Regions:
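Periplasmic-binding protein-like
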Residues: 135-139, 222-263, 286-302
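Extracytoplasmic small-molecule ligand-binding "clamshell" domains
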Residues: 29-115, 125
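Bacterial lipoprotein signal-peptidase II cleavage site
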Residues: 21-31
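C-terminal motif of bacterial Sec signal peptides marking the signal peptidase cleavage site
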Residues: 16-20
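Flexible hinge/capping segments at coil-to-helix
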Residues: 34, 144-163
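Extended ligand-binding regions for polar small-molecule ligands
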Residues: 22, 76-85, 146, 162, ...
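Short helix-initiation/N-cap motifs at beta->coil->alpha
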Residues: 39, 92-103, 148-151, 187-201
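A ligand-binding cleft/hinge motif common to bilobed small-molecule-binding domains
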Residues: 117-125, 177-178, 205-243
Length: 302
């Protein structure tokens, strides 16, 4: 029975992956590559009335809602509001693996990454980030009872038999490396759904992700899933500092005018009652507000 329930859960979680590889707010599939006009991406999008966003299948940031047949999530819904205020009424989603988001943006498969991507100095050298929309700590998804007693990245280091699951291209692999988790103890998955399945199957003893991601996954599993959130949990300490990640939108580096215009509208929205009400269904609270943290500060961090 547990196996049957597990399969049903994984099927429900992965419908976004099976339903379509692209989506728009008006249920139109995205086809081909973006082709900005000579006037720039922003002008082209305004003229067309629509724009493509790249996303990975990771709730609560960006995922396919199979019931509504559209991409949704905290990052996507904020983008819809901000872009509409900029005169762009339609959003077309392009689904890809997390590790392919930046290459896809650079290849002009889409014009914005809306996936809750953390702002890091390394990524700042590849893309232009907006200011963040949220800040959050880390968590582990483990088997019920947490048999390897993993409550931090450091616990993985201390136990050579422990395997830590991470999503390809996500920040968690970087955190693990910086706290000296051996590469041989890391198991790389293409997405959060696969990581959940990997923990259930014993391929990994813990899946490292944002606390919001783990909360969302646990909210979609039943008592028979055999999983739990590792509690308590201690965020990794890197270069003497506790880690708190900040997610934002990413633009091509030659789309600075677009990024600046987006940022201006974003600043008017983040922290408002409208913003809080919009993201509450995805598990976001005032605790996740980015406060005075900016992309410039995060990009300059050492």
């Amino acid at each position: 029975m547990i196996v049957q329930r597990t399969r049903a859960i994984l099927l429900a979680l992965s419908l976004g992956l099976l339903a379509a590889c692209s989506d728009s707010g008006s249920d139109k599939p995205a086809q081909g590559a973006s082709a900005p006009a000579a006037g720039g991406t922003l002008e082209a999008a305004k003229a067309a009335g629509k724009i493509r966003i790249g996303y990975a299948n990771e709730a609560p940031f960006a995922f396919m809602d199979s019931k509504e047949a559209k991409v949704t999530g905290e990052s996507v819904e904020i983008a819809r509001v901000v872009l509409k205020r900029m005169g762009i009424n339609e959003v077309e989603g392009v689904l890809t693996e997390f590790g392919s988001l930046i290459p896809g943006l650079q290849a002009k498969r889409f014009d914005i990454i809306a996936a809750g991507m953390y702002v890091t100095p390394e990524r700042c050298g590849q893309v232009a980030f907006s200011n963040p929309t949220y800040g959050v700590g880390q968590a582990f998804l483990v088997k019920q009872g947490n048999p390897k007693n993993l409550h931090s990245y450091e616990d993985v280091v201390k136990n050579p038999d422990a395997k830590l699951g991470v999503v390809v291209g996500a920040i968690e692999a970087e955190y693990a490396s910086k706290v000296k988790v051996p590469a041989g103890q890391m198991v790389v998955f293409p997405d959060a759904v696969s990581a959940l399945s990997g923990v259930q199957a014993g391929r990994a003893d813990a899946y490292a992700a944002t606390a919001l991601t783990v909360n969302d996954l646990m909210g979609k599993t039943d008592a028979g899933s055999g999983l739990e959130k590792a509690e308590p949990f201690t965020d990794p300490v890197i270069d003497g500092k506790g880690v708190r990640g900040y997610g934002a939108y990413a633009f091509r580096t030659d789309d600075k005018a677009f990024a600046d215009a987006f940022n201006a509208e974003l600043a008017k929205f983040i922290g408002t009652d409208e913003h809080k009400q919009l993201v509450a269904p995805f598990g976001f609270t005032p605790e996740e507000l980015p406060k005075d943290v900016t992309a410039a500060k995060l990009c300059a961090a050492k």
